[in-house]
Amino acid sequence: MERTDAERLLKRQQDYFSTGKTLPVEARKAALRRLAAAIDTFEEKLVAALRADLGKSRSESYMCEIGLVKSELSYMLRHVARFAREKRVPTPLAQYVSRSFEKPSPYGCVLIMSPWNYPFLLTIDPLVDAIAAGNTTVVKPSAYAPHTAAAMTEMLESCFSPEFVAVVNGGRAENTCLLGLDFDYIFFTGRKTVGWVVYQEPEEQLRPPTLEVRGN
């Protein structure tokens, strides 16, 4: 992907987020239901892809990846309304005549970068939470699980428009390109060396990351 293409994609997502269409709880639930239906439709293809990439059996693919994502979807569908609700909080003494509230708000445009070892779980599980929180998302699967990346791309393109959820495939060049863009939040799972790069980038651009790193 060329940088101009990545910038254009992010701009489309920023414009879509600015419309407020991702914010209503019912819109979030509808998106989660579309994702759940797509997973059911593509389950056989996902199982075959996980076997091709990692040699995982059907039972391992379901217990360690697909089933866990379905569980997260079910949980979020039950609780997203409560998570998004405005909450009353204590008011500081100096503002005693006022009432104080805490209102959860999405970050905006989120980048999810996932590893090869649990390529479905560690891509789609954080996507579920990003959607439930009201964000738009760019997903970057690992290049080292190409069959699973292709299956996830087909699945996500079947249920979401790219201004809401988009998939970028590729290797280090695409990683570098995406990390240079002004995402509002980054969720990264992978090697410590890459995680350190992800950590340093937000320091310059004032954006928060979530990092799950391992080894070198």
Short names for language-model regions:
Residues 109, 159-216:
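Conserved NAD(P)+-binding/catalytic subdomain of aldehyde/semialdehyde dehydrogenases
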